[in-house]
Design a protein with these regions (language model features):
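Surface-exposed loop and membrane-interface regions of Gram-negative outer-membrane beta-barrel proteins
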Residues: 61-69, 80-122, 128
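Residue-level signature of outer-membrane beta-barrel architecture
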Residues: 75-79, 126, 138, 185-187, ...
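Transmembrane beta-barrel strands of outer-membrane/channel proteins
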Residues: 50-58, 87-91, 136-140, 194-198, ...
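Outer-envelope beta-barrel architecture signal
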Residues: 44-50, 81-85, 130-134, 179, ...
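Detector for outer-membrane/organellar transmembrane beta-barrel domains
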Residues: 81-82, 192-195, 228-314
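Transmembrane beta-strand segments of Gram-negative outer membrane beta-barrel proteins
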Residues: 41-61, 85-87, 95, 156-157, ...
Length: 360
């Protein structure tokens, strides 16, 4: 009986403490705009967020110049504390829609034809709980996959998505998107991503080239999944994809799988390395294998990187190497010069570029 009374008394004291703290916090908020209370209010009532990112490049093969300008807009509009609308778009302006060199892999990850406006994200995002999240709508695979810090340092297109996927299939990778569903799971050091998309990506709003188009019969379906392990100084990624399609009626409809794996290791506080491999099955495709190795060294506000890869596309071998340095001046501005070397079918090529980044 004494124990029960003492528990009741303790609970009353606890309630009195909570009540007193609540009164004091309320008075402090009214009198001095208490920051802690304001943060709690923000959590309870999420606010819309908007973003703008500009990436500009000047490219040269040391014979002529070319510029590419990419503008990305994004917005997240909360409906509830866990449900929100996500929107994103790109606009591309270039002085020359042709690639400077006829490399099998494009040396620039933002190179694209002129695009006045293309919708890249439009859908509902549901944060089910701290471990599970779901998105349904228009999206791109390179927004969720191949997004490691080291791959993000380089300007080469194969660091945005491996050519065993992008060189073989017209799936939803930059600059096109597709309707689909994406699910993510995270627990401790492990995370899992899986997606199901329309088998072909689009960027316009008219007739067949419609980003809202979903037609498994003619476009096929594209399934993708990746597991990630991130603990201490090691980050490992293993994934695979399957396209069920007839490749626009040019071949019999069948499963077309691709697998990949890559790992990052921090050797010191400043120096990291990465190695990866990807293989595409089936005989009626252009790219079967892709190998890559990278190194990164961080010093103050600068990151120095070297990237080298090998692939075989259309029965031609290509070795590609990039030397780059990304300087982050502040949270808004960055500058990144890069030098690309490629040996394609025995022919050597060299391209230089300077990339300016503005993020708000």
């Amino acid at each position: 009986m004494k124990i029960k009374k003492s528990r009741i008394f303790a609970a009353q004291m606890q309630n009195n403490k909570i009540f007193s703290i609540g009164i004091l916090t309320f008075v402090a908020l009214i009198g001095s705009n208490n920051c802690t209370m304001a943060q709690e209010t923000d959590v309870q009532k999420p606010r819309p967020t908007f973003g703008l990112e500009y990436t500009g490049e000047v490219q040269t093969d040391f014979k002529k110049l070319k510029s590419v300008n990419l503008l990305e807009l994004g917005a997240q509009l909360p409906l509830t504390s866990k449900l929100s609308v996500e929107l994103g778009s790109i606009s591309v302006l270039t002085t020359d829609e042709d690639i400077l060199t006829n490399c099998l892999q494009n040396f620039s990850s933002i190179d694209a034809p002129n695009i006045p406006f293309a919708l890249t994200t439009a859908g509902l995002a549901w944060q089910i709980n701290e471990r599970h999240h779901l998105f349904a709508g228009i999206h791109r695979i390179d927004d969720n996959y191949f997004c490691s810090d080291m791959l993000g340092l380089f300007t080469h297109s194969s660091c945005g998505a491996f050519p065993t996927i992008t060189a073989n299939y017209d799936i939803a990778a930059y600059p096109v998107s597709a309707l689909g569903i994406h699910y993510g799971y995270t627990k401790d050091a492990f995370s899992l991503e899986t997606s199901l998309y329309n088998g072909v990506g689009y960027k316009d709003f008219s007739k067949r080239d419609n980003v809202f188009r979903i037609c498994p019969e003619s476009d096929g379906v594209f399934l993708m999944a990746q597991g990630e392990y991130d603990k201490n100084a090691t980050r490992a990624y293993v994934g695979g994809s399957v396209l069920y399609s007839d490749l626009h009626a040019t071949a019999q409809k069948q499963m077309r799988p691709v697998v990949w794996a890559y790992a990052e290791q921090d050797l010191t506080e400043r120096f990291s390395v990465l190695a990866g491999y990807s293989h595409a099955f089936n005989n009626d495709i252009t790219c079967h294998d892709f190998y890559l190795v990278c190194g990164r060294y961080a010093y103050k506000k600068a990151e120095f990187g070297v990237f080298s890869s090998y692939t075989r596309i259309d029965e031609k071998d290509e070795w590609a190497t990039e030397l780059t340095c990304n300087i982050q001046f502040n949270k808004i501005f960055s500058l990144q010069p890069a030098l690309h070397f490629a040996n394609t079918d025995g022919k050597n090529k060299c391209v230089g570029l300077v990339r300016l980044g503005v993020k708000i």
